[in-house]
Amino acid sequence: MLSKKENLLKLDWIKTNGLIPAIIQDFASNLVLMHGYMNKEAFLKTQKEGFVTFYSRTKKRLWTKGEESGNLLKVIDIVTDCDYDTILIIVEPLGKTCHLNRKSCFFLKENTLNFLSKLEDLIEDRKNFNTDNSYTARLYKSGTKRIAQKVGEEAIETILAAMKNDGDELINESSDLIYHLIVLLHDQNLNFNLIIENLKKRKTEKL
């Protein structure tokens, strides 16, 4: 789970008065999710259990992010900065990180990956929507076979648009294809982050 273990052993707890700042970042989108503080006990608990635990300076106790809401932060990796007084924790967020029901506690300008993440959240939320008001909800209700069929149909339409050298139509059909693919992934309890992570693991020199 951890990288650069030798560097983590060098964390300067004395310099930081026993509290190390911890920056939390989404492993797939690189979105900065939140910031907190850890004492040595919180840090060791995070390492041992694999979920982010902070030290609350106001309540004077440890608290695991998401211990009440269920929106835990699953640890993927932990690295330290060059001064050994700050750590960066790469996580897989299991739900919304911010208490305002947002992906991030920071008000960041939307970029492409942030938009994709928001789109996924919307598509996932539609599982429980009234089918009268949502095309996505109706898709979910129609079942996996129908959703997979729609992905196939949109793939064919994307190919046909490319064969016609129609750029605008290709963009539109590609958008439909990606949308339906995301619905299919969520129907199978998967998400696009897993696709991104899988692509990261592939040897780019062979692409």
Swiss-Prot record:
Q: What class of enzyme is it?
A: hydrolase
Identify the metabolic or biological route this protein is part of.
Answer: Amino-acid biosynthesis; L-histidine biosynthesis; L-histidine from 5-phospho-alpha-D-ribose 1-diphosphate: step 2/9; Amino-acid biosynthesis; L-histidine biosynthesis; L-histidine from 5-phospho-alpha-D-ribose 1-diphosphate: step 3/9
Q: Which reaction does it catalyse?
A: 1-(5-phospho-beta-D-ribosyl)-ATP + H2O = 1-(5-phospho-beta-D-ribosyl)-5'-AMP + diphosphate + H(+); 1-(5-phospho-beta-D-ribosyl)-5'-AMP + H2O = 1-(5-phospho-beta-D-ribosyl)-5-[(5-phospho-beta-D-ribosylamino)methylideneamino]imidazole-4-carboxamide
SUPFAM superfamilies found in the cross-reference section: all-alpha NTP pyrophosphatases, HisI-like
Superkingdom of origin organism: Bacteria
The alphabetized list of GO BP terms reads: L-histidine biosynthetic process
Q: Which HAMAP family match?
A: HisE, HisIE
Q: Give the family per the record.
A: In the N-terminal section; belongs to the PRA-CH family. In the C-terminal section; belongs to the PRA-PH family.
Q: What is this protein called?
A: Histidine biosynthesis bifunctional protein HisIE
The gene from which this protein is expressed is: hisI
